[in-house]
Design a protein with these regions (language model features):
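Helix-coil boundary/capping segments in enzymes
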Residues: 1-342
Length: 342
């Protein structure tokens, strides 16, 4: 019997279009839900497992040995790139309703992450409140940019204020369409996928930090997901260096060094299972900042061997493995998991 519950801090569901459509307002019923497309559409055998049924999700969690899974969208990852604002607002609401229905099959094990359309900040505030207080979602997904705008901008601060009041985590997750500038530069998906997620997370965290968001809203918790972890010590060092030289003029709201906001527990990160930089990141930032992610059911997941692959690593201590698999995600997301759920 496993000694502690294993929590997957970043998994996905492939949205059921028909299921979401039934929650849309009538004027959107006949329209395409996802007007953005993504790369990697024609590579046979690389698209992962398309699952939109909670019973299958739970069975696959059992196969992996996962007690609780925090569930993000797939197509919806790029919602905040949608140019039709009202469509994005309505799709976010419908998706959250559908996801609540999906998770209701076993709410102890299936934890939904709500979508909001930050193209309309007032609507995003209302939807965040509804998603948490009425639907019971565990966190809110934060895009790395909103139509290529810095998410640290003051126009988004009322949203951060409301999320801090709600007491839930903000999970920073990129989608391949969010890094639009990469698509004009590269001709292959492999190039975009290699750099888009870490570079977008670096950009987003830099914007949040120097805008003063972690200082102004000290109750907020952020996680940078699915972007690896090796770049984080570099970024933290570089932000500290820049802050020492220019912070008083260009980041006057920060009362601490950027690294201090990481060390005090406002920022968490996931890692790639085979990432060789992981021990160094643990040494520099601490194992208490790391979260385990299977990325199920996407094409690059290690399912059903993700947990086994991590537990087999000899360069991470047993105590740190427990932190990463169990204690950290409960602290970040603010829920309790139970071994008995499997």
């Amino acid at each position: 019997m496993q000694e502690y519950p294993i929590i997957d801090a970043d998994a996905h569901v492939v949205e059921a279009v028909a299921g979401i459509r039934k929650f849309l307002k009538e004027e959107y019923q006949a329209r395409p839900i996802w007007t953005n497309h993504s790369w990697d559409m024609d590579f046979g055998g690389t698209l992962g497992k398309h699952n939109d049924k909670p019973e299958v999700q739970l069975a696959d969690m059992d196969a992996e040995g996962i007690n609780t899974q925090v569930i993000f969208p797939s197509r919806g990852l790029s919602l905040n790139f949608e140019k039709q604002t009202q469509l994005a607002v309505n799709v976010a609401r419908a998706y959250n309703d559908w996801l609540a229905e999906f998770c209701s099959v076993n709410p102890q094990r299936l934890k939904g992450v709500a979508l909001v359309a930050l193209q309309d900040v007032d609507a995003a505030i209302k939807e965040a409140r509804r998603a948490v207080e009425e639907l019971g979602h565990a966190a809110i997904m934060l895009p790395t940019n909103v139509k290529d705008q810095d998410i640290g901008r003051r126009e988004f601060w009322p949203f951060y204020e409301e999320v801090e009041r709600l007491g839930v985590a903000l999970a920073l997750h990129d989608g391949t369409r969010m890094a639009e500038r990469m698509h004009g530069r590269f001709e292959t998906f492999i190039s975009v996928h290699t750099v888009a997620f870490p570079f977008e997370c670096m950009t987003a965290l830099t914007g949040l930090m120097f805008a003063g968001v972690p200082e102004v809203f000290p109750g907020l918790r952020f996680a940078a997901l699915e972007a690896g972890c090796g770049w984080v010590p570099y970024l933290v060092d570089r932000m500290d260096e820049e802050f020492a030289k220019r912070g008083s003029r260009e980041a006057p709201l920060l009362k601490l060094k950027p690294s201090d906001y990481f060390h005090r527990g406002q920022f968490y990160i996931t890692f790639e299972l085979e990432e060789r930089m992981l021990p160094y990141v643990i040494e520099r930032l601490g194992a208490d900042k790391l979260l385990f992610s299977s990325d199920y059911p996407h094409w690059d997941t290690e399912w059903p061997n993700a947990v086994k692959a991590f537990l087999s690593r000899e360069d991470v201590s047993q105590a740190d493995k427990r932190l990463i698999l169990c204690d950290n995600p409960q602290r970040f997301y603010g829920f309790s998991a139970d071994c008995k759920s499997v």
